Amino acid sequence: MTDSYKVGYSVDALDDLREIYSYIANELLVPETASAQLSRIRKEVRSLDFMPARYALVDWEPWHSMKMYQLPVDNFIVYYLVDDEKRTVTVVRIFYGGRDIDNMNWNHGKVEGYV
């Protein structure tokens, strides 16, 4: 039996990555920084294949009860769910740390793919 988990992104999380890249590359006009930021986020997300519960749970409901974890990466926070039975990690959303997350769409439906 392997100790690793499959790590996947929700459709919303993939959209978040595209928006992060677009903002940094097109609004701030630093495409190299945008690429580097996405690389750092993806690297940290890939590391969730081992001991994904090592990061803190969020402290608000209903997500705390659903065991939503938060992984800080630079100025961004990756929100993800762990299914120990299926040995999967689903990245639900990726937000800028200073963003008002109370008013964000937290649909955690379909998983697009695994890394």
PLM segments and residue spans:
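Basic, Lys/Arg-enriched alpha-helical interface segments
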Residues: 1-66, 109-115
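A beta-hairpin/wing motif
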Residues: 69-70
